[in-house]
């Protein structure tokens, strides 16, 4: 689930944070383009299914991230 999609759906960062069950300040610590996986299912429920949590998206993100680390010039 993309953060931009969640923000567009809920309309404000405050409402997104409330739906995710977090403080607004915690929302600013979300890194990357994806909603943290632990919050994605909650947002799916809060949106009545309009937003979708897809575990495959998160699995692919992790695979890509790991592959990038292995290609780092400091690794052999």
Swiss-Prot record:
Residues 13-33 bind DNA. Coiled coil: none annotated. Keywords: Cell cycle, Cell division, DNA-binding, Repressor, Transcription, Transcription regulation. GO terms for biological process: cell division; regulation of DNA-templated transcription. It comes from the Bacteria. InterPro entries: Lambda_DNA-bd_dom_sf (IPR010982). Signal peptide: none annotated. One of its GO terms (molecular function) is DNA binding. SUPFAM superfamilies: lambda repressor-like DNA-binding domains. This protein is a repressor of division inhibition gene dicB. This is Repressor protein of division inhibition gene dicB. It comes from Escherichia coli (strain K12).
């Amino acid at each position: 689930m993309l953060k931009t999609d969640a923000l567009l759906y809920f309309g404000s960062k405050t409402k997104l944070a409330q739906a995710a069950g977090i403080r607004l300040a915690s929302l600013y610590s979300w890194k990357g383009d994806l909603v943290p996986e632990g919050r994605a299912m909650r947002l799916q429920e809060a949106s009545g299914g309009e937003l979708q949590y897809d575990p495959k998206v998160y699995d692919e993100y992790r695979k890509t991230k790991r592959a990038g680390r292995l290609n780092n010039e400091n690794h052999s």
